[in-house]
Amino acid sequence: MLKVLLLFVLLIAGIVVGPMIAGHQGYVLIQTDNYNIETSVTGLAIILILAMVVLFAIEWLLRRIFRTGAHTRGWFVGRKRRRARKQTEQALLKLAEGDYQQVEKLMAKNADHAEQPVVNYLLAAEAAQQRGDEARANQHLERAAELAGNDTIPVEITRVRLQLARNENHAARHGVDKLLEVTPRHPEVLRLAEQAYIRTGAWSSLLDIIPSMAKAHVGDEEHRAMLEQQAWIGLMDQARADNGSEGLRNWWKNQSRKTRHQVALQVAMAEHLIECDDHDTAQQIIIDGLKRQYDDRLLLPIPRLKTNNPEQLEKVLRQQIKNVGDRPLLWSTLGQSLMKHGEWQEASLAFRAALKQRPDAYDYAWLADALDRLHKPEEAAAMRRDGLMLTLQNNPPQ
């Protein structure tokens, strides 16, 4: 606009001043090696004005041409973006249908023009993996990595997910270790870490992430408790595999008091020691647990114990009966322990006390065995009959 205004000013000046100097046009000589150009000052001014008009016209024409090209390019780019958006929407519908071949095709096609090309390539990689095409999955993943720039977390999460799908468990564990350094409370990273650590037996690492899982609300409390117990049992398995019962004892000794007072771990430790034929240590762990707090779970390994000092355990069981009252499982466990060293009369009394509180087919069978030893065949037969009737009642024929 300024240039046009200047041009009009010059033209007006020429119109006003021109007639004033019409009688005094002057003389201009432009001389070169081969040419001599002669004109008046007025003629030169007119030539310059015309040259400026021509230049402005050329500029205007070029601007229109380039503006048209830019509009054309914008139209083509917008068309590709609209197509990419439509294909992404179609791919999401195909994902809901489980048509992974179409998901990959639609997500990858025109992905560079999508609103979030990294997401398109990552979803295409997962769809290719679902089809078992690892080469295509890797290709899409690498393209996503190129476009992601510094925001590599989504790409690395997808990479770990693909590795787990391929059972490349140690590679996945390496990946989640690096991710946890960057984002230790990312819910999906924690879920993937859980899978990788379980598959590779990284039980200490699994224990380390459980507090972060609680803060990130990954899984409910019951699930996290199950994971914690699984991790501790995994560590027990490793200690037993390395050094047998001695390794188990040393490992247990090195744990914190809080850990050693967990009933579930006491039961698991006793069972591991029984499997190692270290019954005395297993019995001591059970006794220590019962003295601290009564829990039915501590009674479950007792029938498998084969110790040289069962009287100590039986004394503890009787004391528990006094402390917590008549409980059928306590009486039944005491009866089974008494049977191991021939205390048939005491065992029969214990089983009767258990059956008095609730019927149980196993207690009927054990009581019948004790009565046989006491030479009471008729009463033993009656107990077996009652046990059979209870079994049939609980498991009616189909």
UniProtKB/Swiss-Prot annotation:
Pfam families: HemY_N, TPR_2. InterPro entries: Heme_biosyn_assoc_TPR_pro, HemY_N, TPR-like_helical_dom_sf, TPR_2, TPR_rpt. Coiled coil: none annotated. Its main location: membrane. Keywords: Cell inner membrane, Cell membrane, Membrane, Porphyrin biosynthesis, Repeat, TPR repeat, Transmembrane, Transmembrane helix. SUPFAM superfamilies: TPR-like. GO terms for biological process: heme metabolic process; porphyrin-containing compound biosynthetic process. One of its GO terms (cellular component) is plasma membrane. Residues 1-4, 63-398 are cytoplasmic. It is found in: Cell inner membrane. Pathway: Porphyrin-containing compound metabolism; protoheme biosynthesis. It comes from the Bacteria. It is a multi-pass membrane protein. TPR repeats lie at residues 118-151, 328-361. The chain crosses the membrane at residues 5-27, 40-62. Residues 28-39 are periplasmic. Involved in a late step of protoheme IX synthesis. This is Protein HemY. It comes from Escherichia coli (strain K12).
